[in-house]
Amino acid sequence: MLYRWSDDYGARLGVLRRDDPFGPIRWFNIDPCYVFHVLNTVDKTTDDAELVVLQAARYSELWRDDGAHGFDAVMWSWTINLTRGIVSEEQIDERAVEFPRIDDRLVGIPARYGVTVGTGKLVRYDLERGTAEEHGFGSATEPGGPSEAVFAPAHSGAGELSGWYLSYVYDPVRDGSDLVVIDASDFRGKPVARVQLPQRLPYGFHGNWIAG
């Protein structure tokens, strides 16, 4: 293995101002962890502080040995107080998830909904209410395996619930993949479309929606 977890190293977040891209990076120590994928990061201002809020799928550790690694990241939030030079962090949920995505039009600004991939399901978080709902695939004994869900808005001015989530889903019955389309306004309902693909796509397959 090219790299391995070490308890001798810590973890930190770096903040570079967007209005000063050649300026210094401010570093903030956080509890040891590993992050592959970020949901979103937004700037917030209160009466007495300038804040940066980062939300991501967090592993408590990874690559400690050469064996197989579990799918055990959980959604986490870090609030960086730039004024006081401190960081607070909290766990958002206990579900094991990965590949968090929001409506791409809202990257860097507050988004209400974030969708993640769990085992045999998609999990959508309502970041305003602090709740979550699931869309399952397949059966309990042979669940389908979804990949990262991408939001396709119904039109350029559509809200976060006016559009569809697109996910490649592995079908273990036929050993192939489908492109599954879910109505964002009925997340737990049946898919509105399912397109069989001529071959299986690997798990973790990334994608983006580009309007034609």
List PLM regions with ranges.
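Beta-propeller domains
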Residues: 1-212
